[in-house]
Design a protein with these regions (language model features):
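Absolute protein N-terminus
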Residues: 1-2, 92
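Active-site-flanking beta-strand signature of metal-NTP-handling nucleotidyl enzymes
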Residues: 3-9
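Beta-strand elements of well-folded, non-transmembrane domains
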Residues: 9-13, 59
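C-terminal binding/interaction regions
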Residues: 20
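A short linear hydrophobic-aromatic micro-motif
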Residues: 37-43, 83-86
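Short, charge-patterned binding micro-sites
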Residues: 40-61, 90
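C-terminal structural segments of small proteins and small subunits
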Residues: 57-92
Length: 92
């Protein structure tokens, strides 16, 4: 089972693109290491307070994939000052 999902994030406290890039770089590296998923910033690279992250993960079962997505969401919300505005998910 392949799960593709996108998160639209609001970063209300970033003051520059450099600061945003540093926050996202740290976040993405930790997520990749911890959850073994592929993730990139796929949109809004030039917007200081917004970002869209695209994830792909593979699991044998749909329930496991959804559970891992929820763990990633929880990790982001607990460890970073961001707001998840939108979630789009699709099973491939």
């Amino acid at each position: 089972m392949i799960l593709f999902f996108e998160l639209e994030l609001k970063l209300p406290y970033t003051n520059s693109l450099k600061e945003k890039r540093n926050i996202l770089k740290s976040m993405l590296e930790k997520i990749k290491r911890r959850y073994n998923v592929s993730v990139i910033e796929s949109d809004a690279q030039d917007n200081i307070n917004r970002s869209r992250l695209s994830f792909v993960l593979i699991s044998l079962y749909q329930n496991n994939a959804v559970s891992q997505m929820q763990e990633i969401l929880q990790f982001i919300e607990e460890n970073y000052e961001v707001e998840v505005i939108d979630i789009i998910k699709e099973f491939l």
